[in-house]
Design a protein with these regions (language model features):
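Short, structured patches in soluble enzyme cores that scaffold and shape functional sites
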Residues: 121, 181-185, 208, 226, ...
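A short, sequence-level motif marking secondary-structure junctions
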Residues: 124-125, 186, 254-260, 362-364
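Internal mixed beta-strand/loop scaffold within catalytic domains of large alpha/beta enzymes
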Residues: 90-191, 343, 355-358
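N-terminal accessory/precursor segments of enzymes
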Residues: 10-54, 145-215
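Short N-terminal edge-element motif at the start of the domain
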Residues: 209-221, 230-231
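Short, surface-exposed charged micro-motifs
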Residues: 169, 251, 345-347
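Active-site loop ensemble at the mouth of alpha/beta enzyme cores that anchors a bound cofactor
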Residues: 251-274
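C-terminus-biased signal that marks the final domain/tail of proteins
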Residues: 1-114, 220-227, 233-238, 245-247, ...
Length: 381
């Protein structure tokens, strides 16, 4: 078992980005993460829960996602507990807080100068002005790049924080499959009661990200996997941008009422743009007019900015320009109680299976790290 943690960069000694390398069985990796959660982050798992629901959820994950179930066993052992005790929920950590505001574009290899595929991605979140306060509810004070080499599934690199689900928000695996989440503000507007606010049987909104990284090598495999699993929303509906090394891509969304799965296919010869506005509702004039009438910036605004910027590009495109286009939708606004910021900009290279991550890019581009995931010698889980 190998479990190493190293600080990459920090902002004002209050917002930290660290790198973890974890190698071993899924259970041992889970144990290492669990020890970090309890010792460094004081994540409390004593919340009152419905033990019958937890038992049903554990049974589902044991049968449908055994890799995560093994990590959960490690989580539980770090807390001195067992998965046979259904009075605790070790399917995820932390709290279910408000959603992120995000923008991402996938550029397939056919339209880039070096024939590499790229995802350029902004992760935006509100920073409370009292974020330096120990009691401030800002979940991204400690964020991790988790480079993971489990014995029984694909190696991967993912971004996560314990205080917000403790599950991957995005990542890339050794086969070049990349998965990015974006909060789905539109479905939330229509159905504010969609969230369960507690664990249910199936996959919550973030668990599919690591699931696909663990088990899938292509976009086609990822789509088939998503069609087969049960979904529910603890806090916020999300949609997923998924792309592979071969240039295939799609966006996984929900229907307007949140009940059906929708798959929007990308094109191997053109960029695939996605923000917090659902692609399957771009033709919904009622919805677009409602978003246009809002006085605050929203996902539809950012989608149109990206569209305008990309329309001006003469392809093939360079990696530098790919990164620069996303600067046009960086968020940097000050409000009375909080600061709206692009917390991270990430550039995923689906050809080299690597990622560049920059902390607070609107403030300091030098706070950046580069990570590359190794393939196993036989190229299989």
């Amino acid at each position: 078992m190998k479990f190493e943690k190293k600080l990459i960069t920090t902002f004002q000694n209050e917002i930290h980005l660290s790198h973890i390398i974890a190698e071993g069985t899924n259970e041992s990796i889970g144990s290492g993460l669990g020890a970090l959660a309890i010792n460094d982050h004081d994540i409390d798992k004593s919340t009152k829960i419905n033990s019958a629901i937890i038992e049903s959820q554990y049974d589902y994950l044991r049968n449908h996602y055994p890799e995560h179930y093994a990590r959960m066993s490690g989580f539980a052992k770090a807390y001195g507990k067992s998965l046979n005790d259904y009075n605790y929920d070790f399917s995820f950590f932390g709290q279910a807080l408000n959603g992120t505001a995000c923008s991402a574009v996938y550029y397939p290899p056919a339209i880039t100068c070096n024939k590499h595929g790229y995802i350029s991605r902004n992760l935006d979140f509100s920073i409370p002005k009292d974020f330096k306060n120990k009691n401030s509810r800002f979940p991204f004070k400690h964020t991790y790049i988790l480079e993971m080499y489990p014995e029984s599934c694909f190696p991967s690199i993912s971004l996560f924080c314990f205080e917000l689900f403790g599950l991957a928000f995005e990542g890339i695996n050794s086969e070049g499959l990349s998965v990015i989440h974006l909060a789905d503000a539109d479905t939330r507007i229509d159905h504010e009661t969609l969230s369960t606010n507690q664990t249910q049987r199936g996959f919550n909104e973030f668990l599919p990200i690591q699931y696909l990284l663990d088990t899938c090598s292509t976009a086609d495999e990822a789509e088939k996997a998503l069609r087969q699993v049960e979904h529910y929303h603890v806090a916020i509906p999300v949609h997923l941008l998924i792309a592979d090394k071969q240039g295939n891509s799609f966006v996984f969304e929900y229907s307007p009422d949140g009940s059906k799965k929708v798959f929007v296919q990308g094109n191997i010869a053109s960029p695939l743009k996605v923000t917090n506005f659902q692609l399957n509702r771009l033709s919904d004039t009622t919805m677009t007019k409602m978003m246009e009438s809002r006085s605050i910036e929203n996902g539809l605004d950012r989608y149109r900015v990206l569209e305008d910027q990309i329309d001006q590009v003469r392809f093939p495109i360079t990696e530098k320009l790919i990164q620069e286009i996303n600067t046009n939708v960086y968020v940097h606004a000050d409000h009375e109680d909080e600061l709206e910021r692009t917390l991270f900009h990430s550039t995923y290279d689906t050809t080299s299976c690597s990622v560049k991550v920059c902390l607070l890019p609107t403030i300091n581009r030098s706070m950046e790290g580069f990570f590359k995931v190794r393939r196993k010698s036989n190229g299989s889980p």
